[in-house]
């Protein structure tokens, strides 16, 4: 991606040129957006060398080139929050039917998305699940206790936890939830605050 940075006034040639070089020297890929499409970002890294042009009157521009990591662009991260059941502590029958609620997510873009799911457990101990009825994928965390907090990255297949709950061989979580392009009908089961974070992906 070629880019021209224009400095229209108060341009201090050496000082600002060094500042731009320092800004470009960060390692790895980073998001970049443009005014024309402010809700879409590209992951890029600086490549090659920059060239400076100026007229000696505190005005100038720098030509630089960025390298994209993939043919995809990314929309802004969207967060949907859903509370299922009651946030109060229950002392009733643990075998009663768990709370359930439907929630729809409409995914923009051109590619499916593997979301991040955050779960804060309320009520009595029990399973928490998010089931996409469209493609039969889900997140399932079995036998959670009151106050348990988990963050599940379905893309990296990783779980972060702020609780003492331990999953065993016969009690493993499921985390293959996938959002398809368009409408996704999700069934939430169990008492919890559940947050779904997802990012539209666009093939360029």
Where does each model-flagged region fall?
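Hydrophobic side chains in beta-strands
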Residues: 5, 34, 46, 68, ...
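Short beta-strand and beta-hairpin "edge-sheet" elements
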Residues: 29-74
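Oligomerization/assembly interface segments of phage tail-like spikes and tubes
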Residues: 1-11, 58-72, 184
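Compositionally biased, low-complexity regions
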Residues: 2-27, 31
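"Short basic amphipathic alpha-helical interaction patches in structured regions
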Residues: 15-24, 61-62, 78-82
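Intrinsically disordered, low-complexity segments enriched in serine, threonine, and glycine
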Residues: 76-204
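Short, surface-exposed linear patches
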Residues: 23-28, 54-56, 67, 85-90, ...
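A generic structural signal for short, non-catalytic loop/turn and secondary-structure boundary residues
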Residues: 25, 35-39, 57-59, 110, ...
